[in-house]
């Protein structure tokens, strides 16, 4: 039985789990599934429950949850040796000020972009 949590891609059984963790009915449906389709906006709790219940889960979100956010993407690209823009990661503004206290000696020259990790 193909179980779909995707709002557009239909399966034999269709469930929506948007904005919430999987409930007992979702988990029971997963236990009966031979394959599970997940939505793009998948919570980690839904993904982990699907992986525990079924060997065939699409898509594979392992990298997404192992390397969350923008800083996670940079770390993943570095580990895999993939090209990416030069990136510096700071845990907060105090970390930046500690590492670069002199405003005349910034680590990067313009043009540059500052992003929050979310």
Please place each PLM-identified region on the residue numbering.
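Active-site nucleotide/adenylate-binding loops and adjacent lid/helix of ATP-dependent enzymes
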Residues: 64-118
């Amino acid at each position: 039985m193909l179980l779909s949590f995707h709002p557009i891609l239909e399966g034999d059984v269709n469930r929506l789990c948007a904005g919430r963790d999987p409930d007992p009915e979702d988990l029971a449906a997963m236990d009966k599934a031979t394959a599970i389709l997940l939505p793009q906006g998948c919570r980690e709790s839904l993904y982990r429950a699907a992986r525990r219940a079924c060997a065939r889960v699409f898509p594979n979100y392992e990298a997404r949850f192992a390397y969350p956010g923008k800083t996670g993407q940079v770390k993943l690209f570095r580990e895999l040796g993939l090209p990416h823009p030069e990136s510096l990661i700071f845990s907060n503004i105090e970390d930046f000020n500690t590492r670069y206290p002199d405003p005349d000696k910034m680590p990067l020259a313009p043009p540059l972009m500052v992003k929050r990790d979310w």
